Swiss-Prot record:
<keyword id="KW-0687">Ribonucleoprotein</keyword>
<comment type="similarity">
    <text>Belongs to the bacterial ribosomal protein bL27 family.</text>
</comment>
<dbReference type="GO" id="GO:0022625">
    <property type="term" value="C:cytosolic large ribosomal subunit"/>
</dbReference>
<dbReference type="Pfam" id="PF01016">
    <property type="entry name" value="Ribosomal_L27"/>
</dbReference>
<dbReference type="InterPro" id="IPR001684">
    <property type="entry name" value="Ribosomal_bL27"/>
</dbReference>
<feature type="propeptide">
    <location>
        <begin position="1"/>
        <end position="9"/>
    </location>
</feature>
<keyword id="KW-0689">Ribosomal protein</keyword>
<feature type="region of interest" description="Disordered">
    <location>
        <begin position="1"/>
        <end position="33"/>
    </location>
</feature>
<dbReference type="GO" id="GO:0006412">
    <property type="term" value="P:translation"/>
</dbReference>
<dbReference type="InterPro" id="IPR018261">
    <property type="entry name" value="Ribosomal_bL27_CS"/>
</dbReference>
<dbReference type="GO" id="GO:0003735">
    <property type="term" value="F:structural constituent of ribosome"/>
</dbReference>
<protein>
    <recommendedName>
        <fullName>Large ribosomal subunit protein bL27</fullName>
    </recommendedName>
</protein>
<feature type="compositionally biased region" description="Basic and acidic residues">
    <location>
        <begin position="22"/>
        <end position="33"/>
    </location>
</feature>
């Protein structure tokens, strides 16, 4: 009597896995208002992580470091020395 030793092997190898294939959603950081633009109080001026730009006159800083206007006025991006920047909001002067 004959005995056959039959073994079955995969004719297609396993696909394996990869550690890539995902990306985080963009946070939409950066300037939201331009220099010289008129803004109302509460308007977001700059979204950032950390203090890339510092708050100046009439500008507040939120819990996530977002800069916002405290009053109505014109936006001005200014330098603080050689390596720092700030954003200020100056109220428009009403001429009589």
């Amino acid at each position: 009597m004959l005995k056959f030793d039959i073994q079955h092997f995969a004719h297609k190898k396993g696909g394996g896995s990869t550690s890539n294939g995902r990306d985080s959603e963009s946070k939409r950081l950066g300037a939201k208002r331009a220099d010289g633009q008129f803004v109302t109080g509460g308007s977001i001026l700059y979204r950032q992580r950390g203090t890339k730009i510092y708050p100046g006159t009439n500008v507040g800083r939120g819990g996530d470091d977002t800069l916002f206007a405290k009053t109505d006025g014109v936006v001005r991006f200014e330098r603080m020395g050689r390596d720092k920047k700030k954003v200020s909001v100056y109220p428009e002067v009403q001429e009589a």
